[in-house]
């Protein structure tokens, strides 16, 4: 996208926890082991689709932010295989989830209303 390497994932609804689950890992070798993406993997942005009928939208996270939040590893240290995303319409009660929602929603564009959604999308891209 515009000369940048983007990774796309669709977040999954889980029945017992609020928010949606986004798997974000790679299989670097034929060994079968999985690992978090790393800052040096050449990914500029991660786009995650979140849907909860009738609402939907996308999170657009820059690589540097995912490193800062310890979701991407740096020099193969740290990182996560998956994490929860909290769209603006989700109301988590746990303090950690509320903190995550704050930084995540700064990178979210709701596309339910296309006119307004496209303007939001232009901001987060």
Could you describe each region identified by the protein language model?
Residues 15-22, 66-74:
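Short, surface-exposed linear segments at secondary-structure transitions and domain or protein termini
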Residues 17, 41, 53-54, 76-78, ...:
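A generic structural signal for short, non-catalytic loop/turn and secondary-structure boundary residues
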Residues 7, 22-24, 45-49, 57-61, ...:
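Ordered hydrophobic segments in well-structured contexts
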Residues 30-69, 73:
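Structured, beta-strand-rich domain cores
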Residues 3, 12, 28, 52, ...:
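Short, flexible loop/turn elements at secondary-structure junctions
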Residues 113-125:
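Intrinsically disordered, low-complexity terminal/linker regions enriched in Pro/Ser/Gly
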Residues 1-41:
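Short, well-structured hydrophobic secondary-structure segments
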Residues 69-116:
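Helix-rich interaction surfaces within compact, conserved domain-sized segments
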């Amino acid at each position: 996208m515009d000369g940048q390497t983007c990774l796309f994932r669709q977040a999954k609804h889980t029945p017992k926890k609020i928010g949606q689950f986004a798997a974000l890992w790679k299989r670097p070798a034929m060994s079968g082991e999985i690992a978090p993406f790393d800052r040096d993997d050449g990914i500029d942005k991660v786009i995650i689709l979140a849907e909860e009928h009738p609402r939907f939208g996308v999170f657009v996270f820059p690589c540097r932010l995912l490193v800062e939040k310890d979701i991407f590893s740096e020099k193969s240290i740290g990182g996560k295989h998956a994490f929860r995303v909290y769209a603006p319409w989700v109301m988590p009660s746990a303090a950690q989830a509320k903190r995550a929602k704050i930084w995540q929603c700064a990178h979210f564009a709701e596309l339910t209303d296309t006119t307004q959604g496209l303007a939001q999308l232009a901001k987060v891209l």
